[in-house]
């Protein structure tokens, strides 16, 4: 009986910091949209959307061109931070000098509605 109690106590003590880290740090995802190179660069460019600080790990991230889902989108492997929140990078080739509007759309359980962040050519 005492072994069972010790295992239960140990499991409880190991799980509490994890649970505390998740509940104290999980808020809505942070979204950053940027190009790999400056828009005036002659290099082939990529639109990046870095989403961080989210938990649980289930998330949908879409890159948009004029409101429509972009093609040839690649996604990094899911990674996590010391506080047990998750991070993802999504990117796609794009022409920053076109007259199109580019954005990143994030859907997550901590959001009441999808979050759309537009790419700002000047930042």
UniProtKB/Swiss-Prot annotation:
> Does NADP show up as a keyword for this record?
no
Cited PROSITE patterns: IG_LIKE, IG_MHC
What are the subcellular locations of this protein?
Secreted
Q: Where is the Ig-like C1-type domain?
A: 29-118
Here the disulfide bonds are 49-104
Q: Does the keyword Signal apply?
A: yes
Q: Which molecular-function annotation in GO is an example for this chain?
A: peptide antigen binding
| Record text on subunit structure and interactions | Heterodimer of an alpha chain and a beta chain. Beta-2-microglobulin is the beta-chain of major histocompatibility complex class I molecules.
Q: Which PANTHER family match?
A: BETA-2-MICROGLOBULIN, MHC CLASS II-RELATED
Q: What is the protein name for this chain? A: Beta-2-microglobulin
């Amino acid at each position: 009986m005492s072994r069972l109690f010790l295992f239960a106590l140990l499991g409880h003590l190991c799980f509490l910091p994890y649970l505390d880290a998740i509940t104290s740090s999980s808020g809505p995802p942070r979204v950053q949209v940027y190009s790999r190179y400056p828009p005036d660069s002659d290099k082939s460019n990529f639109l990046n959307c870095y989403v961080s600080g989210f938990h649980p790990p289930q998330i949908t991230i879409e890159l948009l061109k004029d409101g429509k889902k972009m093609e040839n989108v690649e996604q990094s492997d899911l990674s996590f931070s010391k506080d047990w929140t998750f991070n993802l990078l999504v990117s796609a080739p794009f022409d920053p000098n076109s007259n199109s509007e580019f954005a990143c759309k994030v859907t997550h359980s901590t959001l009441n509605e999808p979050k759309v962040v537009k790419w700002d050519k000047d930042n």
